[in-house]
């Protein structure tokens, strides 16, 4: 299984999740958000930025995360329409997954493109050690901004 992430840090420690809440977790829990493709990873970054192309951080890298196909995945309960406008709901579900620590990954829908799957990666799960990271430099196309 291959997942993708855009980050300035080539690690999967999830320390960002300790400092800042996300759609699927509250601050104080280590977590890594990843996408199933490089464009999906880019979309998830772009939605949070309001910058010109020349201001895109030069420290950002594309991380290719390779995992065995056999890693454990939790199952998200069925979501009702309007779920993306309910941060308390999504954070509660993500927090449960992270706190339970019974699986490495939780597939979640993208709020930007709900037919697209993203993943929460639990760095506290024992299988987290099986992840291999390759780092790629990249410069986003200026037409994206």
From Swiss-Prot:
Keywords: NAD, Nucleotidyltransferase, Toxin-antitoxin system, Transferase. Its EC number is 2.4.2.-. It is an enzyme of class 2 (transferase). Transmembrane segments: none annotated. It holds the Pfam family RES. It comes from the Bacteria. One of its GO terms (molecular function) is nucleotidyltransferase activity. Disulfide bonds: none annotated. Homodimer. Forms a complex with cognate antitoxin Xre; the 2 toxin molecules dimerize and each contacts an Xre homodimer. Most Res-Xre contacts are between the antitoxin molecule closest to the toxin. Belongs to the MbcT/ParT/Res family. Toxic component of a type II toxin-antitoxin (TA) system. Expression in E.coli inhibits cell growth. In vivo it is probably neutralized by cognate antitoxin Xre; this has not been shown upon expression in E.coli. Probably depletes intracellular NAD(+). This is Toxin Res. It comes from Pseudomonas putida (strain ATCC 47054 / DSM 6125 / CFBP 8728 / NCIMB 11950 / KT2440).
């Amino acid at each position: 299984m291959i997942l993708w992430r855009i980050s300035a840090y080539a690690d999967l420690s999830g320390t960002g999740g300790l400092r800042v809440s996300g759609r699927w977790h509250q601050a104080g829990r280590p977590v890594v958000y990843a996408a199933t493709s490089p464009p999906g990873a880019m979309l998830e970054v772009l939605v949070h930025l309001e910058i010109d192309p020349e201001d895109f951080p030069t420290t950002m890298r594309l991380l290719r995360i390779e995992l065995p196909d056999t890693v454990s995945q939790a199952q998200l309960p069925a979501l009702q329409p309007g779920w993306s406008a309910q941060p308390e709901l999504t954070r509660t579900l993500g927090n449960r997954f992270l706190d339970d620590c019974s699986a490495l990954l939780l597939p979640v829908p993208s709020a930007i493109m709900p037919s697209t799957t993203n993943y929460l990666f639990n760095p506290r799960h024992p299988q987290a050690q099986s992840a291999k990271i390759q780092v790629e430099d990249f410069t986003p196309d200026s037409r994206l901004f």
